[in-house]
Amino acid sequence: MIRTVLAAMALCLAVASPLRAQAAFDETTERAAIFGVVSDMQAAWNRGDYRGYMQGFKNPDVVFVSGGKIKNGWQGALDDYIRNYGPTPESRGTLTFYDMTVEFLAPDAAQLIGHYRLDRPERPMEGINTRLFRKIDGRWVIALNHVSAYEVAPTQQAR
């Protein structure tokens, strides 16, 4: 009899725990947290802090998809940003993320789709990001980042 009661209590706790966790999920708060990550990344990029920019990505095993290639790894991405965008504001440009939407796939997973613009004297860029965010240890990070980029035509640069 005691075993039956203990088994029933264990079953109730097992069922109730996920329900309690889901009830605590506040979509508005979590969406704001994700937008906060992106805002922090934008600010870090614009002050030349590539390492700060990379804090928005899962370390070490983030996946990047861009230019028809799949690249794995946080450190490699950081090295690419430093090499490809350089140390000066002119080479780095000014980054702006905009028109972003977030869809929650689970309490610990969300998809963000948005646009970005990189204003710089040579080769200004614009594109679309599709990002899979995961909540790990209470913090939202990008686990998968897909970019479709294109150079901005000279007539489109003035926004």
Which stretches of residues belong to each language-model region?
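Positively charged n-region of N-terminal signal peptides that target proteins for export
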Residues: M1-T4
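Short, low-complexity N-terminal intrinsically disordered segments enriched in polar/charged residues
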Residues: L19-G56, P154-R159
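A solvent-exposed, acidic/Ser-Thr-rich amphipathic alpha-helical stretch
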Residues: A32-V37, Y50-D108, R117, R123-P124
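Bacterial N-terminal signal peptides
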Residues: L6-A16
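Short beta-strand edge/turn micro-motifs at domain boundaries
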Residues: E126-A153
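A short, structured loop/turn motif at beta-sheet edges
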Residues: V102-A110, F133-R139
